[in-house]
Amino acid sequence: MKPGIHPDYREVVFQDMSNGFKFITRSTIQTRETIDHEGKTYPLAKIEVSSESHSFYTGQQKIMDTAGRVEKFKNKFGARASGKVAK
């Protein structure tokens, strides 16, 4: 591989924010946060869903609206979404 053109491929801790589950894998993701895990310091990437919380893997259906997506959509597109056109 050519030096200097590839991103840094390193071990990163991914943390599922819905249940706190953490796992280490290698990634090129850029993060500002770090975490101490098993005696070492790793970059931390926070994710909303992982295999520990996704309904496909857990077998439990769960409604997740952690970011308030519906309200955010209504605030942004309220008049247009209801069929009314503002003039």
UniProtKB/Swiss-Prot annotation:
Cellular component, GO, one term: ribonucleoprotein complex
Positions in coiled-coil regions: none
Keywords, in A-Z order: Ribonucleoprotein, Ribosomal protein
Cited Pfam families: Ribosomal_L31
A GO molecular-function descriptor: structural constituent of ribosome
ATP-binding as UniProt keyword: no
Example of a GO biological process term: translation
Disulphide linkage map: none
HAMAP family, per the entry: Ribosomal_bL31_2
Subunit record text: Part of the 50S ribosomal subunit.
Family according to the record: Belongs to the bacterial ribosomal protein bL31 family. Type B subfamily.
NCBIfam families cross-referenced by the UniProt entry: L31, PRK01678.1
Protein name, as recorded: Large ribosomal subunit protein bL31B
Organism phylogeny: Bacteria, Pseudomonadati, Pseudomonadota, Betaproteobacteria, Burkholderiales
Gene this protein is translated from: rpmE2
